[in-house]
From Swiss-Prot:
The lineage of its organism: Bacteria, Pseudomonadati, Chlorobiota, Chlorobiia, Chlorobiales. It comes from the Bacteria. Belongs to the TRAFAC class TrmE-Era-EngA-EngB-Septin-like GTPase superfamily. TrmE GTPase family. Its EC number is 3.6.-.-. Homodimer. Heterotetramer of two MnmE and two MnmG subunits. It is found in: Cytoplasm. Exhibits a very high intrinsic GTPase hydrolysis rate. Involved in the addition of a carboxymethylaminomethyl (cmnm) group at the wobble position (U34) of certain tRNAs, forming tRNA-cmnm(5)s(2)U34. Binds 1 potassium ion per subunit. The gene is mnmE. Gene3D superfamilies: P-loop containing nucleotide triphosphate hydrolases (3.40.50.300), Probable tRNA modification gtpase trme, domain 1 (3.30.1360.120), tRNA modification GTPase MnmE domain 2 (1.20.120.430). One of its GO terms (biological process) is tRNA methylation. GTP binds at residues 240-245, 259-265, 284-287. This is tRNA modification GTPase MnmE. It comes from Chlorobium phaeovibrioides (strain DSM 265 / 1930) (Prosthecochloris vibrioformis (strain DSM 265)).
Amino acid sequence: MTERPLTPEAGEAIAAIATPVGVGALAIVRMSGRGVLEIADRVFRKKGGTAFSFKEAEGFSAHFGTLSDSRGMVDEVIALVFRAPSSFTMEDMVEFTCHGGPVVVRHLLQALLDSGCRLAEPGEFTRRAFLSGRIDLLQAEAIGEMIHARTESAFRTAVTQMQGNLSRHLQEMRAGLLQSCALLELELDFSEDDVEFQSRDALRLEVGRLQGEILRLVESYREGHLLTEGVAAVIAGRPNAGKSTLLNALLGHERAIVSHMPGTTRDYIEECFIHEKTMFRLTDTAGLRHSDEEVEHEGIRRSYRKISEADLMLYIIDSSEGDMQQEAAAARELRQRHPESRMIVVANKTDLAPDAGGMIAQLQSETACPVIAMAASKGDGLNELKSTMAGMVEGLDKLHEASVLVTSLRHYEALRNAADSLDNALQLITAREPAELIAFELRSALDYVGEITGKVVSQELLNTIFDQFCIGK
């Protein structure tokens, strides 16, 4: 991976297609950087033969004309001009809107590359917006989350973060940490006078307050990440209980192979579906049983791993046969081993059960979980199951209304590290340890918070974040 400069100075001219590849009514090709106005002048002619130069054009102006390459006209286009610093990247930018055929777009982009641009790298436009100070790192990530949002809640959360709500909250906390750090470091300059510029009692209260705010953000990740990643719902149970049939029923199409032969599913299958504004990441797992067969054994091991990562377990039982007490005991054991996961017991094949009502009552009593009667192959009970699943995560679609919410694992880990540093600082304050030791922990917390907004950043971190963007964003 090539290293890219961290400096926010205007970079070389870059160009890329900003709209999805394929056939459409319109497409956009954009340029940014040093010299893009001159490059635009080389390829664009305004309609009607009017004398025109992009170097003289006002910002936020639109111009209709033709764009040509060395072989002649490529297309009629509309050119939008953005003058530095009033652009997304804070550099000079030009965007060409053309017809959306892939050949047209390819020729237009090539004309810009032949005239002096280089092809932009993934996320380079947004990267330049961050480096120039137009947005912070958290807002840059929010743009990516907004683009990839699959539910209304995920979209609204990304919009809130893009507007800077969490950034402002973190900045306020960072200002408090900086103030305490500055007072401690001032003490070091006057160490011979043995003076405290902030009493240790006041410092302990301030650090405790800031740690409490950070811990509240850490706790918000528990539900917040479900908005962007979806609810991890694992379908588990014994072989041939109907797990794959249930997966297909929930998805509304055949995704998994269904067979009467036990052990057909050797590895887990993951798919997503959306119900009542909530996205569920469904995982169909291998049947849970003892097996000496190597491949099936590995599949079962992976099943238990996915169960351990689940937010919601759908434990499916074949109610047409088997010992219900044994099945209830197995469900209880799974729930006890994974108390952080919610569980729904799905009594499948109730159309074949001799006493479905009594069996449901028994399972509800012995598992203390919601029990849904189903005939997955017929779709019976499917709507009730979906409603129960949505009810288990009730309120998730309203989480985006919170003013600040952590949805990213990167942000969660940085905040957790910051909270640990503040915990260390509190212990040092209580023990009346030297100011330099306390200041070190506060500085560590500052750095962790700074990693989120980009105040403290490395080349590797920037590459990791922006390489996930598409070219043109």
